Structures are given as structure tokens and as C-alpha cells.
Amino acid sequence: MKKLNSSEFRQMFLDFFKEHGHMIMPSASLIPQDDPTLLWINSGVATMKKYFDGSVVPKNRRITSSQKSIRTNDIENVGKTARHQTFFEMLGNFSVGDYFRDEAIPWAWEFLTSPKWLGLPKEKLYCTVYPKDEDSFNVWVKAGMPADHIVKLEDNFWDIGEGPCGPDTEIFYDRGQENNDVAEDDPENFPGGENARYLEIWNIVFSQYNHLPNGKYVDQPHKNIDTGMGLERVLSILQDAPTNFETDLFLPIIHATEEMTDGKKYGENDEDTTAFKIIADHVRAVSFAIADGALPSNSGRGYVLRRLIRRADLNGQRLGIKGAFLYKLVPVVGKIMESHYPEIMDQRGFIENVIQNEEERFQSTLDTGLTLLDDLIEKAKNSDDKTISGKDAFKMFDTYGFPYELTFESAQDAGLKVDKKGFDAEMQAQKDRARKARGDLQSMGRQDVTLMNIKDKSEFEYGVYEEPHAKLIDIVVDDKLVDKANGEHATLVFDKTPFYAERGGQVADHGGIYNQDGELVAKVTDVQHAPNDQNLHFVDLILPMEKGQEYVLKIDKERREGLRHSHSATHLLHAALRQVLGEHTHQAGSLVDPDYLRFDFTAMEPMTPRELKSVEELVNQKIWDAIQVKTTITTPEEGEKMGALALFDGKYGDKVRVVQMSDFSSEFCGGTHVDNTDQIGIFKITSESAVGAGMRRIEAVTSKKAYEYLANRSSLLDDIQEVVKATKPENIVDKIDSIENELRDSQKQVEALTKKINQAKAGEIFDNVKQAGDLTVIAAIADVNGMNDLRELADNWKSGNKSDVLVLAAENDGKANMIISLDQRALDKGLKAGDLIKKAAPLFGGGGGGRPNMAQAGGKKPEGLNDAIKAVIDEISNN
């Protein structure tokens, strides 16, 4: 039998069938194309439907592939069994009306047993066939399979209702009775039975019948072959691995995860081993799914991703890993799979970003959620029906981000149930509330008859800062049209106005309204568009105003100038991003404010410092080039011919306004702009950050605000230079490096002294041994600085055989910590550190967990530590 790594084995399979005239088909995306019946591609044959149903004829009727697949119907079993995975690869060979069993079976036997290929021991191979399928039985015997290794089973008929169907044959590898989970004389101990000895490695379906609606079976005109071999399963045989998780597809991920823990190792105990497996499986699944375009959300595929990421994070927490960590494993996955699937490394930054964002959302509530979940489990244990209520499960989902399935799994592990019907009812009630809220908002809009009945024209005047003769044509007070406004607030409509109404990301103008005598009668605080596109001026009244009178409208010029600078700079920024990052970069939103601008855009990964510098320099260069800004009113069609970018889903009227800055930038836009780019003065990016999956945000300032920003930075630099005592600005970095080195040296000295102090304290603590039942216990509140010091004391205790049980606690900065360690004698008595810590933690306002021999917890009520220690000692005494 050949020893192959995963890459070699995958390629060998494809090469074998290529030698037999097959076309190698690249793996399809995990997201089904034009197949609404599937959430994910879950097998190799799922990508072949168009060929098997005759809607598409392949260039070659013989096809082979290694298809990435996801199955999520039994996520809760992943990590708890040897073979369950959410993400896996299905190797397959397919015949679309070409060869049939006379070729498929001998080829399978050849690939498995030939020394040129896998070279598996023939005596280890078995197969099952459909009892009436004598042809397959005979072909197997002819190929070389011993007749007594062929089992006839009624289950060997592939049929999912109407459509193609037929008998199948499954191939099994005998792993030996020593690897079995049932007795040798167990009735399930046979190939195809429920046992761990005979591992199914390959399934060949002979699709030769058509299942009619009337229940009859008729021959298909073209017979097809559909096969599936689990890459991970066969690899476990080739690498002599007990389970799929000990192969080179998983072990590097598991080892990388071990490095993130506080010393936990795969295989040390069942609980931790399960957690390692879950993390390794789930990071593979989410990495490939995101690379193929899926993103976390609350429905469909997105919900599956969210559930997998959060399930992995929950298990990371159980291993003692703090904070977001799963995203750090993406490059490990990418490196393993790079030879056949380069997309992970190609999109590494984007995938990491999506996972990290999702993790950080969950991490913010994880600790609190776990504490609450522990409380709910204890509450349910003490209830008559041993059930977590649907209301409580929904609170875990709605408030703390725990998908129902995570609560269900935790309850199941504790021997409890969850009220699923109650959870569903709470979920539906929330949806109903949201739907009603949306309906109320819509109905409010529909029922705003007052604004809808305003038909008078109200024109906005570009380039005007003051309108001396604006006629007041409508007044709205308390949702009613009136002729006179003399209260505190009103909404006004003028026949013409210089005030820009908020639209397209640009906020509204502010300013004042004056009477013909020059008296200020109202302050304009906002301007919005009415249903019939009039400009609604929201004002704070100073003097009464009357319909039909003319007023002088004056906008805040400084605010308008800031808006013009920001809006034109936004266009330049958009164009610069497309030039530096590529034309795939699209605007996803913007805010044009007088003090700054915010621009959201599509991006697969964070911008590099070099890219940011290039964008900033390009925008400033266009500002200093003094480009004339040209506006044109035209049709949408003509605007597109001019090269203008059409935003906002292309929803435009008969006429559009195109804003051009030479051939560098051209966009449909109704906002206010500078006349020449040199009026912007200067442009400075202040931040670049993530908004969500696949979206980045740039914030920037212009003109006077940019000068103020740079002046503040310069002043800050002067302060830093003075603090670090650098002779000149260019020496600041070297000076800081020197200070950091000194700090590191000092920290090492502090740590060394702390260690000596802790050793001295350990002697005092460990001398005080108490008796609890027939076990010896050391229990104390130690004068140390938190959990790290407690762990160090626990390590000292382990090396000295000081007692059977160690219970140490500490108070630091108003927080409580506790650690419990058990030696073998205590474990033999049936004690578990995790159970003891869960009993103690609520007494000091905390939660925790751990392994049978060691557990730890943190809380917010240090005043409860003495009671907690007493509770642990009492529990030990009563054991």
C-alpha cells in the first residue's frame, strides 16, 4: 500500500481516470448555480445534473473530478465521530451515456489494488451489491473480488423518487477487529453494517432505470455512471490514521490551534479532542464557503456560516482561547489545499477579514452568554421537565448571538432538552413585531396626505447663496396646512430656494430666513424632499410667518463651502480608488458633511499603506492640477455615453446631471460642487476601516479641516519628540525603539522578581494542608496578581505532591479568579475539577470550566471567594 499525502492522492485519482479517457473537470463553486433546490453543492454528482438530464451535452462523456462539498444536516455530530465533516472532497468518475458496470467496476478494482496506483491489500477489500443485480456480482468476481467478500444488501438501490435510479455497489475497507466498536459476533459486524471496522470508501451507482410517477421502473435510453469516493476516508487508510482528523488535511490545523491554547494537546482527553476536531473542520468549511462568495448572515447559507463560526469560537473558548482566533487558521488551511485549490491563499485577506469581523461580533457577548447558559442549564436541571424554555433559548439567540443549535447542543451534553416550539414562537413574534413596525412606517408615509397634496413647484437654485425674493407658498404645522406660522416649529415650502435638500449622501444646507426689513424670522435646521419633490424647510421660528409673503433666504456659506469641498473630493476619491485598486471597486455608500467625508466601497481586503498613499497622492495631484468642474444636464443614455458612472441602481428620471472633472472623474450627481478642483485646497485620509464583509470605509478631510488635522498631528509629533527626548523629529522612531527595549528588560526583571515572590508565597500556602473527608486539600486566597500567577502556583503544586486537591483564589482590581487542580487520587474518587468550579463560580459572580484535572473561573464579586472555597471543600468532604 502506498503512503501518499493528500495532494498526491487527489492527483493520482484524477490521473488514473485521465488515462482512461476522462476529462478532468475543475471543482465547481460550493454555491449551486441555477439550482434552487440545493443550499450547497453536497457531492460530485450535484454538479452533473445538467449532463445526466440531457439539458447540456458535455464535450467528453467521461468526466472525473475532485469536488469540494458541504453537508450540514448533522453538524452536531462533527467532532464527536471519526468521520463526520461539514466540508469534504468527493472524488468521482462519471459516464454520461458512455461506459457502464463492465468498465466501472474493473477500473475501481484496478485503482484500489494495482501496485501502480494505491496498492491496497486485496484481502482487506469488500463490497456490497443489490441482491437482484447479478451482473455487478459477476463483474466483481471477474475483476478479482473474492465471492465471499461480496455482500448482498437490499439497501444497495439508489432511488430518491421520480427520476433516474438504479442499483449501486459500495466498496469497504476492513480496518480490523481491533478498530471496531462492536463485538466480533455482533449482528452489525459486516460490510454495510453499523460498525467501525468496515469503512465505506467508494460508491458506484448504475443509473439505468427511470422511476415513473405511477411507480413503475423503465429502462433509461442512456445509462449513466455516478461514483463517489470520500477523499478524507481513503486518506486515513493510506496514512494509517485512526480517523480522518489525524491525516495531513487536519493535523496542521489542529497543531496550529494547540499553539493558541495554554498547553492543551489533541488526544489528551475526549472533551478537548472534540473541540480541536470541530475547530479544524469548521475553519475549512467557512474558508472555502467565503472564498466562493457566501457571507455570514441570519438566513440560508449565511446562517450556516454564522453557526459554524460561532460553534468553532465556542469550542475555542472551551480550550481556553480568548478572543477572535479562527481567522488566524485561514492561511494554514490555504497552505494545505494550495496545490489544488489556490483560491484560499488568493483571497486570504478577505476571508480572514470576514471571519474576524464575525468572531468579534460574537466575542463581545460570548463570556456573558456562556455564564447565562450555565445558569440556564442549572435551572433546567432543577426543573421537573429538565427543559430550557423557548423564551430563554430565544434570549440566548437574540441578546447574545447564540444560534439555537448551540444552546441545543450544550443542553444535550448536559442531558437536557430545549423547548423548540417555544423558541420558534418567540422568533415568529419578533418577526411579527418587525413586520408591524415596517407596516406602520409605510402606512405613516401613505397617510401623510398633507405633504402628498402639496403640488406647488419648488425649485432648487444651484450656485446661489442668497435668494432675495422667495415666495412662501405652503406652511405645515402639526401635519396641517396653515396660512400663518407663529409657534416654535414649522415646515415651509418656497417657490425657489438656495437651500440644498439632503440627498445622495450630501447633508442639507443650514441658514436663516429674513423678512424684507432684514430681521431674522426663522433658522433653517434641515431640508428634505417632499413626496412630490418640493424642498421642505424645517425651521425654528423666531417671528411669525405668513403664506404668500416674500422672504430673503440665506444659506450658511461656510457650511456650503465645506459641503462643496467634501463632495467634489468624494468624486476624486472614488475615481482614484478605481484607478489604484481596480475598476471592480464600486461605491457602496457615502456621507458628504461640511467637516469631513465618508466613503464606503467594495473591497476584498484592507488597503495597504502603499495603496492609501497612492490614492491620497492621486487625489491631491488632481486638486493641484486645477481641473475645471463641468456639469451637464442630459438624458441617462447620453450620460452613460459620456462615461458617467451611474450609481444607486440606475434609478433616474428623464433628465440627469453629470458632473465631470476632465477625463478623470465623471458621475451622475445632483449635489453641490466646487467650480475648480483647486478650491478644495488639500485632501487628507484620516482612516480606513472595515464596515462589513467585503466592504471598506475611508474617512477624509479637506481644505481648512485638513489643515487643522495636519496641524494637530504636527503638534502631537512635537509633544512626542519632547517626551521621548529626541533631538529632532526623524529620531523619534529610534528613540521609541530604545525605550521599548528598556521596558522589555525591566519587565523581565519584574517577572523574575515576581516569580521569586510567588515561590516564597507558595511555600506559605502549601504548608497549610487541610483534611476534607479522606482527601488532603490546600485551599487559600493568595495575594497574587490574577489568573496567570494562580496558574504558576498550580504548576508548582503539581510538581511537589503537596496535597490531593488544590483550591486557590485571588482578588485583583475588583475581579475574582479561582483555579482548582486535582491529583490522580482525587480523580479516582470521582471528583472533577470542572464540576467543582461550576459549583463555586456563581458564589463570586462568575463562570468557568475546564478539564477533569484542572479548571478555572473568573467573576465580578471577590467578596464571595471565601464562601466559594468553603463550598468546594464541603463538596469534597461529602463525596
Swiss-Prot record:
Q: Which GO terms describe its biological process?
A: alanyl-tRNA aminoacylation
Q: Which SMART domains match?
A: tRNA_SAD
Fetch the Pfam families from UniProt.
DHHA1 (PF02272), tRNA-synt_2c (PF01411), tRNA_SAD (PF07973)
Q: Cite a single GO MF annotation.
A: alanine-tRNA ligase activity
Localization, per the record, is:
Cytoplasm
Q: How is the cofactor bound?
A: Binds 1 zinc ion per subunit.
The positions annotated for binding Zn(2+) are 567, 571, 669, 673
User: What does the record give as cofactor?
Assistant: Zn(2+)
Catalysed reaction(s)?
tRNA(Ala) + L-alanine + ATP = L-alanyl-tRNA(Ala) + AMP + diphosphate
Q: What EC identifiers does the entry list?
A: 6.1.1.7
Gene Ontology CC terms: cytosol
Q: Which UniProt keywords apply?
A: Aminoacyl-tRNA synthetase, ATP-binding, Cytoplasm, Ligase, Metal-binding, Nucleotide-binding, Protein biosynthesis, RNA-binding, tRNA-binding, Zinc
Please name the InterPro entries in this protein's record: aa-tRNA-synth_II/BPL/LPL, Ala-tRNA-lgiase_IIc, Ala-tRNA-ligase_IIc_anticod-bd, Ala-tRNA-synth_IIc_core, Ala-tRNA-synth_IIc_N, Ala-tRNA_ligase, Ala_tRNA_ligase_euk/bac, DHHA1_dom
The record ties this protein, via NCBIfam families, to: alaS
Domain note for this entry? Consists of three domains; the N-terminal catalytic domain, the editing domain and the C-terminal C-Ala domain. The editing domain removes incorrectly charged amino acids, while the C-Ala domain, along with tRNA(Ala), serves as a bridge to cooperatively bring together the editing and aminoacylation centers thus stimulating deacylation of misacylated tRNAs.
Family, according to the entry, reads as follows: Belongs to the class-II aminoacyl-tRNA synthetase family.
Name listed for the protein in its UniProt record: Alanine--tRNA ligase
Q: What is the lineage of its organism?
A: Bacteria, Bacillati, Bacillota, Bacilli, Lactobacillales
What gene is behind this protein? Answer: alaS
